[in-house]
Amino acid sequence: MKSLLDLFKQFTPDEHFDAIKIGMASPEKIRSWSFGEVKKPETINYRTFKPERDGLFCAKIFGPIKDYECLCGKYKRLKHRGVICEKCGVEVTQTKVRRERMGHIDLAAPCAHIWFLKSLPSRLGLVLDMTLRDIERVLYFEAYVVTDPGMTPLKKFSIMSEDDFDAKRKEYGDEYTAKMGAEGIKDLLEGLDLDIEIDKLRNDLTGSEIKIKKNAKRLKLMEGFKKSGIKPEWMVLDVLPVLPPDLRPLVPLDGGRFATSDLNDLYRRVINRNSRLRRLLELKAPEIIARNEKRMLQEAVDSLLDNGRRGKAMTGANKRALKSLADMIKGKSGRFRQNLLGKRVDYSGRSVITVGPTLKLHQCGLPKLMALELFKPFIFAQLEVRGIATTIKAAKKEVETGTPVVWDILEEVIKEHPVMLNRAPTLHRLGIQAFEPILIEGKAIQLHPLVCSAFNADFDGDQMAVHVPLSVEAQMEARTLMLASNNILFPANGEPSIVPSQDVVLGLYYTTRDRTNGKGEGLVFSDTGEVRRAFDAGELDLNARISVRLTEWSKDKETNEFVPSTKLWETTGGRALLSEILPKGLPFSNINKALKKKEISKLINVSFRKCGLKETVVFADKLLQSGFRLATKAGISICIEDMLVPKEKTSIIAHAQKEVKEIEQQYTSGLVTAGERYNKVVDIWGKSGDEVSKAMMAQLSKEKVIDRHGNLVEQDSFNSIYMMADSGARGSAAQIRQVAGMRGLMAKPDGSIIETPITANFREGLNVLEYFISTHGARKGLADTALKTANSGYLTRRLCDVVQDLVVTEDDCGTLDGSVMRAIVEGGEVIESLRDRVLGRTIVEDVLHPENRSVLIKAGVMLDEDLIEELEAAGVDEVKVRTALTCETRFGLCAKCYGRDLGRGGLINIGEAVGIIAAQSIGEPGTQLTMRTFHIGGAASRAAIASSVEAKSNGVIGFNAPMRYVTNGKGDLVVIARSGEIIIHDEHGRERERHKVPYGATLTVKIDQTIKAGAILANWDPLTRPIITEFAGKVQFENVEEGVTVAKQVDDVTGLSTLVVIDPKRRGATKVIRPQVKLIDATGNEVKIPGTDHSVTIGFQIGALVQVRDGQDVGPGEVLARIPIEGQKTRDITGGLPRVAELFEARTPKDKGTLAEMTGTVSFGKETKGKVRLQITDPEGKVWEDLVPKEKNILVHEGQVVNKGESIVDGPADPQDILRLLGVAELARYIVDEVQDVYRLQGVKINDKHIEVIVRQMLRRVVVENVGDTSYIAGEQVERSALLDVNDALRADGKIPATFSNLLLGITKASLSTDSFISAASFQETTRVLTEAAIMGKRDELRGLKENVIVGRLIPAGTGMAYHEARKAKDLMDDSERRAIAESEAAELEASQAETSDENAAAE
């Protein structure tokens, strides 16, 4: 019996493998796969519908059409299995072998494989060291190649045309061999001796850069061939494999027609041309005819492998390009992305969602019909267990009739069985969550309102999919990891995701507001019960100010018990009643205020940190219920009267119109240019709009009421519209402004501002022109949104791909490295506090108390909220913490360097896929970012101009290291440093704020001066940039010639004339001269720079207005010239999504700035045409120089000392330069800060560590510099972890390790250059990746998540990590151990079977 069962058992090969290798197939290998040669192009007989013998669907080669039945019908049934029918030659077996048996075609002439020819760089070209053009000419029979020069002076590998060939044939006769087509190429490949070639190339890695690069490429390729045991001649095919027929099916349609796979067409062409060629060769046809046929065969093989790669694509009957083998695997609808990474899932359904306000957070409502369908296997099992149905068929019938017992069983199997809900697009981890189903009538799924923000769902027709976890393990994972009540924080930033919104917020806000002179004001209550009774009796208003005695519970630190404390609170009725739902341990002060949306979010956060997960979930549910109930009770509604138009509106608008008229008049009389007029008009209207909205908000937000003493007082308004905006429930000041103020300025689709504003608002109504203006720009917004979604999705995909294999693999890597974190301060304002930056990170070095230097926190501790409060109390302003970038774990990250798992609130677990989480956190808000680049101009830039800085706090003044200044004649201090900063310290010497001060600013404070908050620290002219002298002397002009280098400008109004430096190119000057100033001292000599013999020369830039006269005496700190900032081209600022993509792709920005390559003194060399020669000389006398285009803005002047990495030419920095000159830490800081700037502008919070994780992956490859004793080639790019492993092994043997330098790759490049070819091929450029991998004979170690999904295993992350470790441990055991385990398992099984049979016997 047992053996018979084994007979029927499906045979599955052992799935235990650790790696996948790809290579090239030799002709012998292809023949060994094949079950026979396909000789005829026929498919099936049109009369019998049976496959033709030796054709593309031949049953003899590929297997039977019907299970266990030969083609002619002589052998049927299972008893003949394995017999080969003597009449039709078909083996009697299962028909599914037609999916796996391959055939082959013997080619009459060899054909080159197009992938190795045309996929750049051409592998054939590299091996043979010929150009692609030449190889193509040979392959497609346009030229000969010399394969054996014999005794002639011809060179091997040389190309000759037909005429040359004839001439040489006459000259040398048969002394030499030259061939055409793939045969020639094949001969050349066979003639290569890899060992000799490799030696030659290894010795030839010298000479010019280009040559070295080329030789290194060839060397790598040859070594790849040698190592993988692949012969180069296999790149030319002698035998073509034929795909199994069931993978290229022929399907009969109704009406006697057939639908066929394109591959059949392509194969048919190859077979036709091949047979014809074979016949021609047998007939000894003329060379030219055979040659043409060979070329056609080559083309047919090309289009079978990759149609359209060369020449025109082959088309079918309907002019559509045929889908070749290559097209089947690449692209979105190819094998990788469509079938391997994006499978459809069984046991799933989808339906519309509706709101379920009565559900608990961990529940969802599941329609009965859906549940019945989804839980069928469980219902069938129960029916069998209960003995209601004996077979599956009977059970099916039972379920279909829908007897009451079925519904009872459904109730039972659904209990405690979580289901997963998913809303597309699933942009982050919270897009799929598990819930316990509650059966409901109807056909819509009910969703808990609090999880909507995580799913980004609303109830306007959204649909959601339901998936059922089947196995016990899956159910357990769903319950512990995915249950909605376990996911209450966003993994992106650690904020709560279950924050109430809209109605709930409005209800809670209304309840916790206080009102002057409410009913029952001033009453004192003994407890909340009494308040409740007074409220129910109608004696107390919710908003009335009262006093209540309340009990608070606080946790005792020693005993961990809750201890009560009671005190009298001044509060309102609503707040007192709300205090009933507070969990133990949450102080009342948290809700003793008007609860706006932000406050409620904070409240839930505090609750989670203080009271734990369970309490918080219950609390959130209670808040939700109260909010809905109170919003209903409050009865807030809006009417036209609520939209108060400010009284001042008419006068403000009239004033603005008057100003605009004045400017129009100035314009007509030629006093201002058109551009200035436009800017000023836009400015005026912008200001007026703001004034109107200020007046409107002032009027809306306050109302006058009479208090109980009869006085008129002001209180926060109870205007419904104001309450909605103020609470954060819906709407904002900007929207109210459009309803009740004035709509203001509108933008055109190109982003420019229309200068006539809409002065009306929605309450007054718009006229036709105003309506048209407002629709004009709005349409662009809708078009943008569609583009944005696609762009953002693509960014997320690239991010996911680059980090997909980054998993936390160990607890602690033991690194002593880290990066110093301090608060981000810009313009004296703290943009991101130290608290936000270091929360949940591990400390590297002991944190010392700033005053008494005692150890506050030991190294290796993760900072939580309590510790951070200690830090803040002590006033620590910088902490060195571990980051993902400094982690030393190979092929992964360690938990300590990553720190807190933001989505769960504790230290990250081993096995967490932090890479994917980082990619999702950055990609998910992508759709909220803007798409356009901002043109600075018009109103936008006006607001950004600052002309002074003031202190925000009291303290002592200090300056940073690069700050330099001189004292001018008036005794003012003038800044002459490019990157000077004023730092304010408090009395303990801790830095409180720092302000950047521009070149040429006047300092109003001195070092170590004590100042009060609000003091002006420095001021400057915001509209011009000065050129300042550091020394005293008499001005001597050089090259200042009117009409050549300068022009006189006379001001129309004042009549004063100034000299403006002009571009001499326009004046047709031959040599480029630059106007400059030298200083002459009292003795008539040139003033020298102290310590050098350089004269002080100060050059003027084009567009500068000269402020001094020739021969004038100047003192230090005086302004020689001013450059108007208006005159400069305004740079477009790339913002939003494109900026983020640009940073992660590590693109070199256009018009990039230059950084100083070394520390030294600046000088200017001889100018070339249109370029300035900028030189830096270091203390040792080494000189570095760069040519800078004239129009660029050089930030340094002659004789200035610069530090390595300082900006010397204006423009955005190039990340590659930052990495090279300033190192990894500085680069990471740059990318993190820049990305955060974009997101911060949109109000999106993302934790820095996510960006760091991405940067780590961008830096994961290194360039080998000195090869040492390794087998690498200098200049080769390798995986950092792999190289470090190799180096460790070498050190252990006492050999020389390789040295390397860091390499920054953009995310696309980094994804494609990963060691895993499966992951790279499924990302982009599939052909190129696979070609390269096959030639190198690459092994994929299946380390990442993607590779494992593709080969169909559990991913090595989370619970899958344990599975893989156990599997590897089992592989390491020896056979005896394995046998012992198997025997013990079998014994257990037999024992249990014996027990059940005993029980059954007893029962009978």
UniProtKB/Swiss-Prot annotation:
Residues that hold Mg(2+) according to the record: D458, D460, D462
Cofactor note: Binds 1 Mg(2+) ion per subunit. Binds 2 Zn(2+) ions per subunit.
Enzyme class: transferase
Binding site for Zn(2+) 2: C813, C887, C894, C897
InterPro entries per record: DNA-dir_RpoC_beta_prime (IPR045867), DNA-dir_RpoC_beta_prime_bact (IPR012754), RNA_pol_asu (IPR000722), RNA_pol_N (IPR006592), RNA_pol_Rpb1_1 (IPR007080), RNA_pol_Rpb1_3 (IPR007066), RNA_pol_Rpb1_3_sf (IPR042102), RNA_pol_Rpb1_4 (IPR007083)
GO molecular function, one term: DNA binding
GO cellular component: DNA-directed RNA polymerase complex
Cofactor: Mg(2+); Zn(2+)
Enzyme Commission number(s) of this protein: 2.7.7.6
Residue ranges of the region described as Disordered: 1377-1404
CDD domains registered for this protein in UniProt: RNAP_beta'_C, RNAP_beta'_N
Superkingdom, natural source: Bacteria
SMART domains attached to this UniProt entry: RPOLA_N
Family of the protein in this entry: Belongs to the RNA polymerase beta' chain family.
Protein name: DNA-directed RNA polymerase subunit beta'
Organism: Polaromonas naphthalenivorans (strain CJ2)
Lineage: Bacteria, Pseudomonadati, Pseudomonadota, Betaproteobacteria, Burkholderiales
